[in-house]
Amino acid sequence: ESIGNAAWASADPGLQYHSTINEWHTCPEGGEIRASNPCSEYMFLDDTACNLASINLMAFQKDDGSFDVDGFKHAARLWTIVLEISVMMAQFPSREIAQLSYDYRTLGLGFANIGGLLMAQGLSYDSKQGRSLCAAITALMTGTAYATSAEMAKEMGAFARYADNAPHMLRVIANHRRAAMGATDGYDGLEVAPVPLLAADCPDASLV
């Protein structure tokens, strides 16, 4: 009750499920994930950092109410490239953080204004349609970012610690794909299955 009241009053503390987080860990050969940044959008190894970017979803709301899928994919691809470049441009508070951030080359791509988009489309925040729209946009962004990262790795080489973690990363990506395809079972290495994207509930068929 004390934790709930504190979270309601100040948004802290945050509670994290250690086992679930580490089951989705792409690089466990480097150690377990023990914590996150204060807002919890970055969960990775100790002494690492990444630059963050958020795409404004309302910028892709068309006049007819539909979502600009191609424009959003282009933005996700472009920002993935920008964030990759930023690894070389960033300044870090310690040599260790700088080295590990360079070795793993993590990037943080997200979106903002999902509440505004749902209101503009007349969807309840906690409706099946609202949740499925959010899931579809998130899946599209995640898949585009991973595909763009793979393209860059093909040309420039993978990040330094990829070889050690390749099976884990491919397992996590495969689990993401299963969730995006609506699977309710068959996940690899997960005690708790994720909530899948339900394409039938998504109000914009172009997203699925």
Predicted regions and their residues:
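Short hydrophobic-aromatic micro-motifs
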Residues: 50, 204-207
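Function-dense linear segments that define catalytic or interfacial modules
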Residues: 7-121
